[in-house]
Amino acid sequence: MDKFQIHGNGPLKGEIRVSGAKNAALPILCAGLLTADTVALDNVPNLQDVRTTLKLLRLMGMQAEFDGARVTLNGADVNVLEAPYELVKTMRASILVLGPLVARFGEARVSLPGGCGIGARPVDQHIKGLQAMGAEITIEHGFIHARAKRLKGARVVTDMITVTGTENLLMAATLAEGETVLENAAREPEVTDLAHLLVKMGAKIDGIGTDRLVVHGVERLHGASHSVIADRIEAGTFLCAAAATLGDLVLRGVQPDILDTVLDKLREAGARLETGDDWIRLAMPHRAKAVSFRTSEYPAFPTDMQAQFMALNAVAEGTARVTETIFENRFMHVQELNRLGADITVEGNTAVVNGVPRLSGANVMATDLRASASLVIAGLVADGETVIDRIYHLDRGYDRMEDKLSAVGAKIRRIA
């Protein structure tokens, strides 16, 4: 099992090109199921979750080629309408094939999902929405089985904001008969990116970027070309690493406007920031000031950046309160950060971080994707050697992280 070996050694300096967004790429790949034509995608990150999704699509009969950051999909020969447990258990996003399969083929069998161990992420909102659109759904033997001759437009109000739920129902609605209104829709940039691809494929969608999506169903969708948006979480992770190490870092290929809350918190911590159309520069002249925040749905502070800011706060001046409102169980990195010398206590869904002047290297274990990233940041500022076990979590969401960090001065390497 691979590990990272890190020696803390001063500031990160240089340039990093940010990869495409995992959380946009996965639904966009699944959208290829909606048409028999070819869909060509650029800026696709080379990640474990992307490779798992392509494996699942090929299993269904999809032709899928992955060359560099370009993926070419053709769904003309899709004939297996099932997502088996063996693949779904490793990646919750597999549920995203449900909507497209029911919409185009009238049937789908999808195993109940697995993935990160950070609490309940119920799929009941997906099921509720598809039922409102006329699908007959049963759950038996660990599978969701959905059937519909043709989905019918409906007004769907989800009980909570759900990103994958919005994406699944949005894809399903594109081929439904009549008008579908998705109320309380997720507004994340990755949802917007999916909607832009669907429009290129011939879908009729109003309200893109808002919490009310109106979809006028069409008979069929056609092929299209699309470039996946930059990964705002990868960008935020590298910015936190630069801030923690008192670095001077330029990120290329990013969209600063979808990172507003993260950039605001970095400024509050004392970072100097400059931005252009597709770049961000961060310089950190002194030890960070502790910053308090609470996670919430976009455009508020993203839960996927909570752990990385926890690592920054661990070595900041002062005390920060970090409140997690999206997922339960999302403080599993606290115990590992404390092994490195951090002073963090958890009270319910809030962590209190008392900044310390320095951390010291130790052996730690990654527990989920973003927790892994927080341990990398902590390792970069810790005295001595830090070894992070179970980095397979990290490989699910970061494209060649060690290579990108090494190129800007980090002493980090992958060991078996």
From Swiss-Prot:
Reaction equations catalysed: phosphoenolpyruvate + UDP-N-acetyl-alpha-D-glucosamine = UDP-N-acetyl-3-O-(1-carboxyvinyl)-alpha-D-glucosamine + phosphate
GO-annotated biological processes: cell division; cell wall organization; peptidoglycan biosynthetic process; regulation of cell shape; UDP-N-acetylgalactosamine biosynthetic process
A Pfam family recorded for this sequence: EPSP_synthase
Residue positions where 2-(S-cysteinyl)pyruvic acid O-phosphothioketal is found in the record: 116
SUPFAM superfamilies reported in the protein's UniProt record: EPT/RTPC-like
Annotated CDD domains: UdpNAET (cd01555)
Enzyme class: transferase
Annotated localization: Cytoplasm
Keyword check for Chaperone: no
Residues that, per the record, bind phosphoenolpyruvate: 22-23
Residues that coordinate or bind UDP-N-acetyl-alpha-D-glucosamine: 92, 121-125, 304, 326
GO molecular function, one term: UDP-N-acetylglucosamine 1-carboxyvinyltransferase activity
Example of a GO cellular component annotation carried by this entry: cytoplasm
InterPro entries in the cross-refs: Enolpyruvate_Tfrase_dom (IPR001986), Enolpyruvate_Tfrase_sf (IPR036968), MurA_subfamily (IPR050068), RNA3'P_cycl/enolpyr_Trfase_a/b (IPR013792), UDP_GlcNAc_COvinyl_MurA (IPR005750)
Superkingdom of the organism of origin: Bacteria
Pathway the protein takes part in: Cell wall biogenesis; peptidoglycan biosynthesis
Main location group: cytoplasm
Residues annotated as the enzyme's active site: 116
EC number: 2.5.1.7
Function: Cell wall formation. Adds enolpyruvyl to UDP-N-acetylglucosamine.
NCBIfam families: murA, PRK09369.1
Family classification: Belongs to the EPSP synthase family. MurA subfamily.
Protein name (database record): UDP-N-acetylglucosamine 1-carboxyvinyltransferase
Organism of this sequence: Cupriavidus taiwanensis (strain DSM 17343 / BCRC 17206 / CCUG 44338 / CIP 107171 / LMG 19424 / R1) (Ralstonia taiwanensis (strain LMG 19424))
Lineage: Bacteria, Pseudomonadati, Pseudomonadota, Betaproteobacteria, Burkholderiales
